[in-house]
């Protein structure tokens, strides 16, 4: 009996020891890190200046970036990373500063913050340049950038591509970073992807595999769509031939891609015809609402991520540096910097959109047949956005004349709801869907605009303009399906409604753009150790057919809902 107890006790001790060992191994096997982007550091002004007509946020700029507060926001972000004992390193996917091409001192200031962080914590920072960081014939060229940020990836690099900011570095024993400079230094915002850069990524992905490492890619420009109408409204913010590029990256074994540039918090997923899955995590600007970054915990089996925010700064240091902040500003910041940043964003976005509502800004040239129609619509849009939504003489009353019901809400005017929707996109994990009250109000405002302003225009002019718009937006392939579905729901479609459908056809498709089952801010995806490649020809064919069929059915289903809300 004693012998049996002894054996049992030994077994318990052995199993317990193994369990402890496996637990310790699991903890050691985790890789924890933070990802931020678009810091857009500005040297703070000596004194604030009134830039817009807003009661509180009168110093907001057209980009809605908290420029004077930016340095302190970066400080607090680094403080949070330092305080997190599990955080092993920090990735920053470009636009470290705002005016880096012409004001080199901004880079020096940011590098000093990074050096202090690394010296105090021992945690490395890895950077990649963005379109604001360097240029040709500028105060900062790529050699200057690499020299200033030598300690933040380049000195530890396994490979460096001369004349660019691209490099590779091992993050730990299992993972290798491929830091790709996606910029064209001769351009303002568009990408500089080339066959040579793609081939370099291919070589580095193969080398990582040969060395027993999983490749993680970081670049500034988006790999996948993150914004409704991105190919139209933000065509310079995503790499060219993005699906082809995503297919190559996925089939080369890259699963995680970190990008910035678009200033939105969004996660997008794509599956190549071979069945390989790739995720593009676009991280919003750290110094704009919602002052957000992501935190990742990576194991072979699973990649967990969560959004974290900066909700306070040293306001004493702020007022000591820049004069002009009122006590109301400081009180609102101290009550919650995130709420303050949202108000700042809405004020800045309204100012920017008010300046940008021009046909040329929308990519519609003056010689286009539908230019006049669009110009009429845009002119009416500004009026509808500015007028009160409710009350005597308000938009709700005007809409009723066209049998359009504007639901009651707390919004004051059209600008209020439009900027709210924009803020949701910046924050990610958008809380709206096509059934929501807020989307209904927005769509019916657009419907009212077109019905009120275009009702007197001849049908043949509207029909021709509609067909050319379908072609301009690249949605002409679904004209017949859209028209058939609209007729089945609404009956015969008028020329005004047909033009309206053409104008918003990209928006229709955009409502399914984020319907991919991947949460933007908080979630989990399969790790690098999971197998998803399906290389058999039959599987490849099935993947293509299933994907195409799913997209088509999703568009048509949601279009039906959209029409009921939009047309009224």
Give the label of every model feature segment.
Residues 26-34, 43-47, 164-179, 210, ...:
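Beta-strand-turn-beta hairpins that frame and shape the catalytic cleft
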Residues 26-104:
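N-terminal active-site segment of His-dependent metallophosphoesterases
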